[in-house]
Amino acid sequence: VGRITNLTSPRYIHFVSDEKAYVTQIWDNRIFIVNPKRYEITGYIECPDMTAESGSTEQMVQYGKYVFVNCWSYQNRILKIDTETDRVVGQLTVGIQPASLAMDRNNKLWTVTDGGYEGSPYGYEAPSLYRIDAETFSVEKQFRFRKGDSPSEMQLNGTRDTLYWIDRDVWRM
């Protein structure tokens, strides 16, 4: 049994290789780089335009040498990280609080936003589902929900050709 300590508030882990993984955090403006074989932190990736108090990175998916990360709480961006340099090389603005991230079999990224909440200092809007081209890192389509809807837990099926999410019921697209 091994353990990696001194992380702020770890959320998700993505394995780049057997000896390198990224660990996202909430309430930290860094993504930690760890060596899972040696149980140690080897570095971190600074997330632009975030403070430690407003930092929030969540789920990760990989396309070629790039890892995409959704920035959730009080954020509205998807980050693109070059795994060879461990640096953020792109940012894409989406709606308030992208809560889930997935990549389908056609190399399209999908993210669903929760829209924040009424009275939030960051804002409150209708949530949206976004389809993003991983190659060009641009939004191809936005599907808007109603204000007050709460889409979450977006997932793809096993063949990665059908999208599911929860919003009071289980939805399929």
Where are these regions (language model features)?
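Predominantly soluble domains enriched in secretory-pathway, periplasmic, or organellar proteins
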Residues: 1-173
